[in-house]
């Protein structure tokens, strides 16, 4: 497994002998499969490709992913081979929502550009038209996806007196919408009316390139796009074109289409705020993610049903 933060290693050590991969770099599926030989379970990170090559290793019973998302794992193949897949939901919701709002505000108010200006000794004094941004307060926030993280972002928006609209294939109950002060709209309305769009959908075949050239063209020229979900949800080439030609005001990104590679156009864009996939990176949250992943795997190793089992069908497959 990759290095885990405490108390993860101690939790696992109580259940099994533990081998830790030393340097934390991303692995290939072949190297993971080789490392998994003789193991009943593995702890994986979101950059690890868990393919059928890995899942067919004899004796492997559980893959514990240290993330909410598990698009790096071939869940269908895992189920076919009777391998349980677990994740770490519910832990990082608030921390990720904090960061989504941080990206939103940094992009809207040009914080990174201002920081670079001062550090580059180009600050010559206050001016009425210097570094003009867009207001967050009383703006319209559009949420693409209103799961746990999306709802956490909506709660924060209330403190800024924002109008919150959302689009999701699984709508909230009317009384929940009323209590949260959010309104469900169609995609066209969300794209055309939002001052800020924050993405909170899982990566699936249907959500890949959910935001492309056509969608970006529908957005306001003063709009800000924020993505803390998964990189391939946004067509980066189309986003680069929209930023370069000022079809939208700015973007705040924590995830990338071909991560860890970043489109050079995003790096060159002065109106992009870029972070290295750190939305959940607070000490408390990451430590708890490691602890939950360890408990998931420890439960499976002991013959139990892990609490965060993604594919319960795997329990019915002889292994």
Q: Which ranges hold each PLM region?
A:
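Conserved beta-strand positions in the Rossmann-like core of class I SAM-dependent methyltransferases
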Residues: 19, 165, 232
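Glycine-rich Rossmann-fold phosphate-binding loop(s) that bind the pyrophosphate
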Residues: 146-147
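Phosphate-binding beta-alpha-beta segment of Rossmann-like dinucleotide-binding domains, i.e.
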Residues: 81, 89-140, 152-155, 166, ...
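Short, well-ordered coil/turn residues at beta-beta hairpins
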Residues: 1, 44-45, 66, 103, ...
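An N-terminal-biased, well-structured beta-alpha scaffold segment characteristic
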Residues: 1-86, 212, 318-319
């Amino acid at each position: 497994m990759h290095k885990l933060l405490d108390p993860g290693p101690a939790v696992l050590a109580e259940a099994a002998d533990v081998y830790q991969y030393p340097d934390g770099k991303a692995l290939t599926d072949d190297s993971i499969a080789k490392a998994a030989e003789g193991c009943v379970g593995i702890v994986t990170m979101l950059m690890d490709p868990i393919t059928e090559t890995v899942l067919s290793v004899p004796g492997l019973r559980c893959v514990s992913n240290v993330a909410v998302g598990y698009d790096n794992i071939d869940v269908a193949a895992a189920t076919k081979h009777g391998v349980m897949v677990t994740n770490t939901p519910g832990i990082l919701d608030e921390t990720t929502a904090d960061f989504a709002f941080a990206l939103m505000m940094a992009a809207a108010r040009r914080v990174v550009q201002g920081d670079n200006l001062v550090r580059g000794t180009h600050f010559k004094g206050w001016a009425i038209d210097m570094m003009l941004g867009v207001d967050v307060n009383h703006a319209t926030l559009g949420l693409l996806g209103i799961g746990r993280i999306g709802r956490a972002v909506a709660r924060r928006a209330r403190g800024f007196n924002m109008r919150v609209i959302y689009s999701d294939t699984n709508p909230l109950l009317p009384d929940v919408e009323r209590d949260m002060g959010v309104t469900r709209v169609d995609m066209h309305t969300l794209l055309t009316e939002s001052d800020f769009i924050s993405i909170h959908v899982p990566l699936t075949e249907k959500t890949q390139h959910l935001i492309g050239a056509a969608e970006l063209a529908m957005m306001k020229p003063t709009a800000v796009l924020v993505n803390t979900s998964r990189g391939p949800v946004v067509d980066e080439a189309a986003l680069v074109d929209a930023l370069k030609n000022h079809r939208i005001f700015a973007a705040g990104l924590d995830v990338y289409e071909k991560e860890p590679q970043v489109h050079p156009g995003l790096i060159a864009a002065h109106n992009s705020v870029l972070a290295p996939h750190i939305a959940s990176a607070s000490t408390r949250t990451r430590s708890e993610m490691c602890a939950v992943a360890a408990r998931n795997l420890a439960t499976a190793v002991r013959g139990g049903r892990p609490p965060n089992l993604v594919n319960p069908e795997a329990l019915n497959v002889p292994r």
